[in-house]
């Protein structure tokens, strides 16, 4: 399908150095790749720098941001610039469509899902449940919660649109992928601007606001207030911070 246009991609503005902060976690990757089943031909929609892209399969990657695609590894799958709402592929071109942490950036969720259905019989979506937020959002950045809730529907509605099951994706305490909820047991990491650079939810908020809230987090860590509330998290192996897989039936 053709004829759709899109504004300047978000990640053309916030994606510099993204690949350094966002290294796919192997445990999360294993769950995603298992959900793909025996699919051999896979389109990775919203692929960015290539996180969670399956190996040993024929993959085509698509992303609206040339800046993000430029950060892909030299041996990564071939990639094209495009948007989810108008995939430049024929009907049934793939065995499966994968979309990882990208749905909340789409301009038209229903159109994007229709396109996934058009090009592949099996769909695997790695996303998050807006009903479950990590403490960094609820306690320090409620503006992030408001922003996501405004743009993204509840997970049961998205699952119904896909006719998909929902699988919880637990996040390890030592998760290598620096998304917003990854440091639930390592709060000091949020104080590092280089770590925050890989978190789209933070990069789309006013940076003076972010700095002031991180100053408050630093003060809570120094005083012991954070550990009084959440210190038990430091010893946990994994936690449900709202991430999930949607897998078509």
At which residue positions do the language-model features occur?
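Conserved Class I S-adenosyl-L-methionine
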Residues: 166-249
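Conserved class I S-adenosyl-L-methionine
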Residues: 1-43, 51, 66-71, 122-156, 177-179, 191
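Local beta-strand N-terminus motif with an aromatic residue
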Residues: 39, 94-95
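Short catalytic micro-motifs in class I SAM-dependent methyltransferases
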Residues: 101-105, 127
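A conserved beta-strand element that flanks and buttresses the S-adenosyl-L-methionine
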Residues: 98
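Class I SAM-dependent methyltransferase SAM/SAH-binding core
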Residues: 41-87
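A short glycine-rich, Lys/Arg-flanked "PGG" loop and its adjoining helix->strand segment in the class I
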Residues: 110-123
